[in-house]
Amino acid sequence: MRVLPATLLVGAATAAVPPFQQILGLPKKGADTLSKPLHDFQEQLKTLSDDARRLWDEVAKHFPDSMDHNPVFSLPKKHTRRPDSHWDHIVRGADVQSVWVTGANGEKEREVDGKLEAYDLRVKTTDPGALGIDPGVKQYTGYLDDNENDKHLFYWFFESRNDPKNDPVVLWLNGGPGCSSLTGLFLELGPSSIDSKIKPVYNDFAWNSNASVIFLDQPVNVGYSYSGSAVSDTVAAGKDVYALLTLFFKQFPEYAKQDFHIAGESYAGHYIPVFASEILSHKKRNINLKSVLIGNGLTDPLTQYDHYRPMACGDGGYPAVLDEASCQSMDNALPRCKSMIESCYNTESSWVCVPASIYCNNALIGPYQRTGQNVYDVRGKCEDESNLCYKGMGYVSEYLNKREVREAVGAEVDGYDSCNFDINRNFLFHGDWMKPYHRLVPGLLEQIPVLIYAGDADFICNWLGNKAWSEALEWPGQKEYASAELEDLVIEQNEHQGKKIGQIKSHGNFTFMRLYGGGHMVPMDQPEASLEFFNRWIGGEWF
């Protein structure tokens, strides 16, 4: 979850949106692109109820600086579409949709469910030797095109280093919202990292050691993805992911028969319940979904926001970052914050959920941010504010902006950004941030195992909050799961056998792991422990 001060501040309901104040100096085309959403926003402000206006005005009173920040709508990325001849395969959704089969009772039915007519999948076999990333491992890159809505999602597939004919397939998603999954590829769990010389370095602990992995830049206008339109909530993005997987497995049926898992971190705590539910809602599908893994996620804000104060004030296993006065201030703000989140849960209205995000983030995350401590790791200061505290993220961006890299993978955009904060704000202004996506998890547990894991040094999506929401979740196994004790998690698969790497509790299809010494990005901080639990999870040890 990416939180910057600008992300947390917006104008109150009574503040007029100055005409194009945000886009002075932009070409007229850019102004035209923004005029309609800004006009729509102004019109919607006029329709607010008195209660909603009071709520927004209260936020403005507490955080007057927010009056200076109005909604930002993302401009399209500059791009040049490559000709069809560039691609080795183009899978037409309309062709897939047109395939009918005979059902068990002799009736005609579509081979796969879903509305796929508007989608195409473009595929290029990428030469591993061209970039020196996992030489000898089969790779595909390309785009999922939603031709109806002018959306183009970039993906990068790496085959398993081990036994690709039998190893499972995993979709990896970074969060944000609005951050590229290529960050996960090169900073965390992919086959290579990028060093200070902007060169790829082989990763011994890559997750494609025993699984094939797809890294997806979503939603649109993130990483190498682009669009003339925008996605501003999690549900809208779910349709695209289902289409991508359906067309990919149609082109490569050898992977479709393998077990499939979805993994991700941070705001993927929103994405994954929705994406998995979307997949499972289609009874006729070619996606063999077996489990989901959510790392340091934001899934149940009402429960998780309870635990910012304890984590910041010394109750999470690390020394306090804040002084007593700041901790007391957070305690004082919590009841109002929780009341606002409850209202969001009850209505799921943007006009209620947006003020909850602004108030709670300023009151409960803001005090920590102002210390200069890394929100993704309580153990140290933010070392590079321009790259979300990590110099390595800057190395990744510099590498992915190289012309030869973009050419090798078939990227169609003129540049790469690790995170698009316009997207971040769009999701916030749609009210998506505080919505109760955890309510989808019981439905998942009825069909597949769910793993919640958390590096215990993270503040922003900390282990205390993730453990708490998993225990508070209402499902048939809640009592047994909540009462289960944390047990030691130790290495079993290499020469460090017996080394304690964390704690685990599990019942039925639900499992929680605390990973020692991991921040927000566990595979980066604890690569050995990360690969250990990942291999054992996809191997079915806990389900």
Curated annotation (Swiss-Prot):
One of its GO terms (cellular component) is fungal-type vacuole. Its main location: other. Disulfide bonds join 179-419, 313-327, 337-360, 344-353, 382-389. It is an enzyme of class 3 (hydrolase). GO terms for molecular function: serine-type carboxypeptidase activity. It catalyses: Release of a C-terminal amino acid with broad specificity. Glycans are attached at residues 210, 509. Its EC number is 3.4.16.5. This is Carboxypeptidase Y homolog A.
